[in-house]
């Protein structure tokens, strides 16, 4: 395993641990999800370039589009929750009230 793959795997793991540990605030959870998607994008791009797989060259772009959609939906949900309740604590959100 090369140093680049280890760094990307470490970035993904740190983002996953951050998502599991700091899930009380919605903003920190969204930042950790973005870190996970960015490391997946870089790892997928490097893998496709290394094995010269031209048929799957659009796959990282599709992943990046899904990451952008996830970020837009997450930020709009964060704005809605923070204007409605005045905080971004995930524990205080009840699905029965929304």
From Swiss-Prot:
Catalysed reaction equations from the record: a ubiquinone + NADH + 5 H(+)(in) = a ubiquinol + NAD(+) + 4 H(+)(out)
Keyword Transcription: no
Keyword Translocase: yes
A Pfam family the protein falls into: Oxidored_q2
Subunit structure: Core subunit of respiratory chain NADH dehydrogenase (Complex I) which is composed of 45 different subunits.
Name the record gives this protein: NADH-ubiquinone oxidoreductase chain 4L
EC main group: translocase
A GO molecular-function annotation: NADH dehydrogenase (ubiquinone) activity
Protein's organism: Rhinophylla pumilio
InterPro entries registered for this protein in UniProt: NADH_UbQ_OxRdtase_chain4L/K (IPR001133), NUOK/Mnh_C1-like (IPR039428)
Keywords in alphabetical order: Electron transport, Membrane, Mitochondrion, Mitochondrion inner membrane, NAD, Respiratory chain, Translocase, Transmembrane, Transmembrane helix, Transport, Ubiquinone
Superkingdom as given in the UniProt entry: Eukaryota
Stretches of the chain forming a coiled coil according to its record: none
């Amino acid at each position: 395993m090369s140093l680049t793959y280890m760094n990307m795997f470490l970035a993904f793991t740190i983002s996953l641990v951050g998502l599991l540990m700091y899930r009380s605030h919605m903003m920190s959870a969204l930042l950790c999800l973005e870190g996970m998607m960015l490391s997946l994008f870089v790892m997928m791009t490097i893998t496709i370039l290394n094995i010269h797989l031209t048929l799957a060259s659009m796959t990282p772009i599709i992943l990046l589009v899904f990451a952008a959609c996830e970020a837009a939906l997450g930020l709009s949900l964060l704005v809605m929750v923070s204007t409605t309740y005045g905080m971004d604590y995930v524990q205080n959100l009840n699905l029965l009230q929304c």
